[in-house]
C-alpha cells in the first residue's frame, strides 16, 4: 500500500506527471468539465470532501508556483477565499518560493480550466470554490 499523502491512484498519477507550468483545476461540485479534459471525481456527497481538504492534500505532493482564482470568489465566497489565500501563503513559505495569485472573471476561469491536465472535482457546494494550480519545480 502506498505510504504517501495522496492515496487516490488517478490523483497521484496526475501529480507525478506534471511538468513545469502545467495546470490542474480543483473545483467545486458544480464546475463544468470540458470535453477532452480528464475528470478526477472525488465528490462523495454534498460537502465531502471539502474544497480545502482537496487543496491541502494535493499540495502536500505538488510544487505550486501560481494560482488563478475567479475574482467573483472574493465577494461571493469570502471564507473559502480567505482560507485558500492563507493556505497558499503558508505553502509558499514551506516550499521556499513565491506563489503568484492572479484573478480573472469566472468566464475566463472556465476557459483556462479547459487547458488543465485535469479537473479535480471536490464535494464543495459553495460558490466559486475553484482554483487553477500551476506546477513549479523543486529545484
From Swiss-Prot:
Pfam families: RbsD_FucU. Coiled coil: none annotated. Substrate binds at residues 28, 106, 128-130. Catalyzes the interconversion of beta-pyran and beta-furan forms of D-ribose. Signal peptide: none annotated. The active site is at 20 (proton donor). The lineage of its organism: Bacteria, Pseudomonadati, Pseudomonadota, Gammaproteobacteria, Enterobacterales. Belongs to the RbsD / FucU family. RbsD subfamily. Pathway: Carbohydrate metabolism; D-ribose degradation; D-ribose 5-phosphate from beta-D-ribopyranose: step 1/2. It is found in: Cytoplasm. Keywords: Carbohydrate metabolism, Cytoplasm, Isomerase. This is D-ribose pyranase. GO terms for cellular component: cytosol. Its EC number is 5.4.99.62. GO terms for molecular function: D-ribose pyranase activity; intramolecular lyase activity; monosaccharide binding. InterPro entries: D-ribose_pyranase (IPR023064), RbsD-like_sf (IPR023750), RbsD_FucU (IPR007721).
Amino acid at each position: 500500500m502506498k505510504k504517501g499523502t495522496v492515496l487516490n491512484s488517478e490523483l497521484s498519477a496526475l501529480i507525478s506527471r506534471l511538468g513545469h507550468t502545467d495546470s490542474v483545476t480543483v473545483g467545486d461540485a458544480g464546475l463544468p468539465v470540458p470535453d477532452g479534459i480528464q475528470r478526477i471525481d472525488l465528490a462523495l456527497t454534498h460537502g465531502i470532501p471539502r474544497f480545502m481538504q482537496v487543496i491541502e492534500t494535493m499540495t502536500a505532493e505538488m510544487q505550486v508556483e501560481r494560482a488563478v482564482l475567479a475574482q467573483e470568489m472574493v465577494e461571493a465566497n469570502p471564507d473559502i477565499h480567505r482560507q485558500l489565500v492563507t493556505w497558499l501563503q503558508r505553502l509558499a513559505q514551506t516550499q521556499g518560493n513565491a506563489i503568484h495569485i492572479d484573478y480573472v472573471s469566472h468566464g475566463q476561469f472556465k476557459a483556462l480550466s479547459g487547458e488543465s491536465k485535469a479537473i479535480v472535482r471536490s464535494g464543495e457546494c459553495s460558490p466559486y470554490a475553484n482554483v487553477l494550480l500551476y506546477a513549479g519545480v523543486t529545484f
